From Swiss-Prot:
Gene Ontology terms: biological process: translation
Disulfide cross-links: none
Species, as recorded: Yersinia pestis
Name of this protein: Large ribosomal subunit protein uL22
Family: Belongs to the universal ribosomal protein uL22 family.
Function: This protein binds specifically to 23S rRNA; its binding is stimulated by other ribosomal proteins, e.g. L4, L17, and L20. It is important during the early stages of 50S assembly. It makes multiple contacts with different domains of the 23S rRNA in the assembled 50S subunit and ribosome. The globular domain of the protein is located near the polypeptide exit tunnel on the outside of the subunit, while an extended beta-hairpin is found that lines the wall of the exit tunnel in the center of the 70S ribosome.
Keywords: Ribonucleoprotein, Ribosomal protein, RNA-binding, rRNA-binding
Name of the gene this protein is made from: rplV
Subunit structure: Part of the 50S ribosomal subunit.
Organism placement in taxonomy: Bacteria, Pseudomonadati, Pseudomonadota, Gammaproteobacteria, Enterobacterales
Length: 110
């Protein structure tokens, strides 16, 4: 049974989160959690929370056994960017894009 968990509008760029997502794709859930725990990146904490949510969803909603679960799919899409302005010299201004991402984790017992 496939179970999904999503985190929308995560305050990190999709490019940075994808680096972490690639580490756990296809792994068993226990191994993936261990990998994320010792990965020294902000995105690792975001992905770990979504993975824990997917595990809880599988256990509570589908009655799945945690030991059998694998990360079958994980993907990161770009979310909306917040536009901000950075004042510069001589009355000019630069645009700053504060990027967000949508993190989706799918776990399955197959």
């Amino acid at each position: 049974m496939e179970t999904i968990a999503k985190h929308r509008h995560a305050r990190s760029s999709a490019q940075k989160v994808r680096l972490v997502a690639d580490l756990i794709r296809g792994k068993k859930v226990s191994q993936a959690l261990e990998t994320l725990t010792y990965t020294n990146k902000k995105a690792a904490g975001l992905v770990k929370k979504v993975l824990e949510s997917a595990i809880a969803n599988a256990e509570h909603n589908d009655g799945a056994d945690i030991d059998d679960l694998k990360v079958t799919k994980i993907f990161v899409d770009e979310g909306p960017s917040m536009k901000r302005i950075m004042p510069r010299a001589k009355g000019r201004a630069d645009r700053i894009l504060k990027r967000t991402s949508h993190i989706t984790v799918v776990v399955s017992d197959r």
